[in-house]
Amino acid sequence: MASGILVNVKEEVTCPICLELLTQPLSLDCGHSFCQACLTANHKKSTLDKGERSCPVCRVSYQPKNIRPNRHVANIVEKLREVKLSPEGQKVDHCARHGEKLLLFCKEDGKVICWLCERSQEHRGHHTFLTEEVAQKYQVKLQAALEMLRQKQQEAEELEADIREEKASWKTQIQYDKTSVLADFEQLRDILDWEESNELQNLEKEEEDILKSLTKSETEMVQQTQSVRELISDVEHRLQGSVMELLQGVDGVIKRMQNVTLKKPETFPKNQRRVFRAPNLKGMLEVFRELTDVRRYWVDVTVAPNDISYAVISEDMRQVSCPEPQIIYGAQGTTYQTYVNFNYCTGILGSQSITSGKHYWEVDVSKKSAWILGVCAGFQPDAMYNIEQNENYQPQYGYWVIGLEEGVKCSAFQDGSFHNPSAPFIVPLSVIICPDRVGVFLDYEACTVSFFNITNHGFLIYKFSHCSFSQPVFPYLNPRKCRVPMTLCSPSS
């Protein structure tokens, strides 16, 4: 009874224009009351349309000077806003704003409303239906989405199990590798301590990086599974609850369910990793003795800029990289990129002029797919033609160099054959591990230039013998078209 009286009172203090509780109510001579904003808007419209002012309800004319604030109604509205509804009025099937039963479903807003809500400005023009008419339709949608979610939950749990298994497998594998490294280096402890430490550090970093990534993936998989579980719980709660709970915000829930996409964990294929294998211990001992010997002649090499080379040089004169491709403007506004003089003219000489003695330096070429390095007797300005075919890279022209192209093809450049002396003889080089760091040793008096694969324990890559050094020679670097820099290493690195 009290709830019904309360509803009747609310109807009496509801604005006939906006159908909401009166805000700053104003009364006319006829006794009708309106919100101040609603009456002002109606007054402007009436003046424009007819030139007269009349009550929006009974059409009785009024004078603006007779409009008065209705404080009594304002007090009633204020009390109504403070009054709590009775337990009966607090039922979930009644509108919290108007106290009417929630019998309608608004398609645009995806929620249940009462008949007064339907007539309010908020829902004006929206498509509304009886809740009984749409409940079954949304129940079918939710059920279908729930089945899909359960399948994704199973997939998520399988992914979570797989990542845990892979994490354990990686840990076991790397622990085994560490043990193997320790056993292999024990036989060469006196001269291989630094190599053992380096190898273990690489494995530790590999373990740290991979396990860190896998742990991160595991956390993401756990969060992903939990997210799906929570969404399933929400849907099950709706399906088990009342029609009102089922429909309230149902479109948003369905959209969330349909947008669920399982993220695959990051994996690391074991067949692509670098696996440590101990070389022949006797041969390795000889290699280390040779490398240790030539490293006694390590000189601090930097490059010397010149007007011939297009190479980009760092401020410390240690890094050399390929320039940006030039943009060529063609006919009808077309453009394309090209590397002008990309081979020979990106070469650069070291600043040290060598006329005698033994000299050693190392070049970091990690992550580069193409490079040329070695020793040069100086640029040949008259030999800057046919540069795309490497014609210049021959000992007869003063170049004792090796190079890499396409990331895997390592070659040495020798003099051309008797039948084709202008083209260099390309010597394919067999390297077990592609070098990330190359050591160059020049013995001026012995007329030799040797190249060492520092990445693979310092094994010899290639050696030029019987070199004809008729003039001063210089270290030579060419980054080719690969924009990753090549770096001259300092003796302390």
Swiss-Prot record:
Location in the cell: Cytoplasm; Nucleus
UniProt name for this protein: Tripartite motif-containing protein 5
The gene coding this protein: TRIM5
Positions of post-translational N-acetylalanine modification: 2
Sorted UniProt keywords: Acetylation, Antiviral defense, Autophagy, Coiled coil, Cytoplasm, Immunity, Innate immunity, Metal-binding, Nucleus, Phosphoprotein, Transferase, Ubl conjugation, Ubl conjugation pathway, Zinc, Zinc-finger
Positions of region (Required for interaction with GABARAP and for autophagy): 185-198
Enzyme Commission designation: 2.3.2.27
Pfam short name (any one): zf-B_box
Source organism of the structure: Pongo pygmaeus (Bornean orangutan)
Start and end residues, zinc fingers (B box-type): 90-132
Keyword Membrane: no
Coiled-coil segments on the chain, per record: 131-223
CDD domains the record matches: Bbox2_TRIM5-like (cd19761), RING-HC_TRIM5-like_C-IV (cd16591), SPRY_PRY_TRIM5 (cd15822)
Residues bearing PTM Phosphoserine: 86
GO cellular component annotations of the record: nucleus; P-body
Domain B30.2/SPRY: start-end pairs: 281-493
Listed PROSITE patterns: B302_SPRY (PS50188), ZF_BBOX (PS50119), ZF_RING_1 (PS00518), ZF_RING_2 (PS50089)
